[in-house]
């Protein structure tokens, strides 16, 4: 069974590097209000992990999508994990807080990404890495343009400004 998790605060959690990350209020509200979103692409045998199953159903019904879906809360996930159910997790994005939530629900660490995997996600999510590794390839595509410079301090910024006169 695939279990989807909507965690729009993922980028902030990833950048924080904290296991116990509390996102800003806006991120928490977005996660709460749109918790049902993965149900749109989930298959009928999949589940969406939410804080409040009743609220998720109410919001999902507003979409008028006429397809079956399963919402589960953390207690249900803990029960399923304790029974040894085969589960594959698909969060919006993997980060340490998501992994920690799943561990607290008795999901075995062996079925979750390790620190090396999470650190690699953090590395390739950085704008600097993307500017260096993705942009050169993307700008080779017909009708695309782009330029990026990475500045690590004010001195590098001043050098760039003196050469280009704008950002």
Residue ranges and their predicted role:
Residues 1-50:
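N-terminal-proximal low-complexity accessory segments that begin disordered
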Residues 27-41, 49-167:
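Conserved N-proximal alpha/beta basic substrate-recognition cap immediately N-terminal to
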């Amino acid at each position: 069974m695939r279990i989807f998790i909507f965690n729009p605060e993922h980028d902030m959690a990833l950048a924080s590097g904290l296991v116990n990350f509390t996102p800003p209020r806006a991120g928490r509200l977005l996660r709460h209000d749109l918790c049902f979103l993965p149900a749109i692409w989930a298959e009928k045998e999949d589940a969406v992990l939410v804080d409040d199953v009743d609220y998720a159903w109410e919001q999902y019904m507003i979409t008028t999508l006429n397809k079956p879906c399963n919402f589960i809360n953390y207690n249900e996930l803990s029960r399923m994990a304790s029974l040894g159910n085969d589960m594959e997790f698909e969060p919006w994005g993997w980060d340490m807080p998501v992994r920690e939530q799943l561990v607290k629900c008795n999901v075995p660490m062996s079925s979750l990404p390790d620190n090396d995997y999470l650190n690699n996600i953090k590395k390739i999510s950085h704008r600097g890495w993307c500017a260096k590794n993705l942009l050169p390839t993307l700008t080779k595509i017909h009708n695309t343009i782009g330029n990026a410079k990475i500045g690590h301090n004010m001195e590098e910024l001043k050098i760039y400004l003196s050469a280009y006169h704008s950002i």
